[in-house]
């Protein structure tokens, strides 16, 4: 295994991107490169609609924006049942089987994705409600109390996940690949 890893990640083989190459000011839209929007629908013979809504997000090296995005995704559709989308789409209206918002960080960009599963007849209502909740977050800042509670909840989730050995190993591996050190 070490021989195989060394073949791809030796000192002579530079990583594809480093913190220095992620120049936020060189990009537009807060460092997020632009991309053409698309909408693809695949028809399957079932009663359920599975939908993913995505957007480009800050890269691994954009610390301030990255941390804010982690918190935003947790507030919007994190694992807790009190996330905004879970409250509106599942608890209040019963439109979805499940909904979540996730953030994946790469060396040169990132991806925020909201995914949901619902009955096909509820999909348009769900998309409208998601747009409404995102617009609300854009136009009405969270109260200090709600923001403090969201930060506290995220810290609690991170503390619980840090008890998992696999999570610790993945985190150390990411740190080693991205920054050349384990912290």
PLM-predicted stretches and their roles:
Residues 84, 89:
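Active-site palm subdomain of RNA-directed nucleic acid polymerases
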Residues 28-31, 39-43:
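A generic local secondary-structure boundary/capping motif
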Residues 80:
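Conserved phosphate-interacting/catalytic interface
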Residues 1-23, 41, 46-51, 57-60, ...:
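Charge-rich, well-structured scaffold segments of protease-associated domains
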Residues 34-35, 67-69:
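Flexible glycine/proline-enriched surface loops and loop-helix/loop-strand junctions
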């Amino acid at each position: 295994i070490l021989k195989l890893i060394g073949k791809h990640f030796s000192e002579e083989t530079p990583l594809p991107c480093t913190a220095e190459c992620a120049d936020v000011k060189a990009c537009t839209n807060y460092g997020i490169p632009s991309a053409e929007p698309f909408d693809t629908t695949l028809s399957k013979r079932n009663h359920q609609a599975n939908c993913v809504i995505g957007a480009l997000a800050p890269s691994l090296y954009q610390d301030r924006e990255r941390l804010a995005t982690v918190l935003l995704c947790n507030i919007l559709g994190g694992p807790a049942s009190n996330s905004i989308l879970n409250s509106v789409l599942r608890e209040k209206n019963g439109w979805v089987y499940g909904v979540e918002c996730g953030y994946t960080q790469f060396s040169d960009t990132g991806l925020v994705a909201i995914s949901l599963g619902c009955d096909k007849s509820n999909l348009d209502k769900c998309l409208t409600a998601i747009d409404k909740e995102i617009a609300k977050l854009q136009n009405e800042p969270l109260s200090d109390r709600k923001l403090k509670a969201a930060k506290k909840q995220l810290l609690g989730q991170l503390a619980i996940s840090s008890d998992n050995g696999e999570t610790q190993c993945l985190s150390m591996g990411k740190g080693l690949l991205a920054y050349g050190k384990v912290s």
